[in-house]
Amino acid sequence: KRKCGLCKYRCCSGG
């Protein structure tokens, strides 16, 4: 599950 909270690119991408 990828949850985008504060980061919109690194969190979504898996960063």
From Swiss-Prot:
Keywords: Disulfide bond, Ion channel impairing toxin, Neurotoxin, Potassium channel impairing toxin, Secreted, Toxin, Voltage-gated potassium channel impairing toxin. May block voltage-gated potassium channels (Kv). Expressed by the venom gland. GO terms for molecular function: potassium channel regulator activity; toxin activity. Belongs to the short scorpion toxin superfamily. Potassium channel inhibitor family. It is found in: Secreted. Contains 4 disulfide bonds. This is Peptide 2900. Signal peptide: none annotated. GO terms for cellular component: extracellular region. It comes from Tityus stigmurus (Brazilian scorpion).
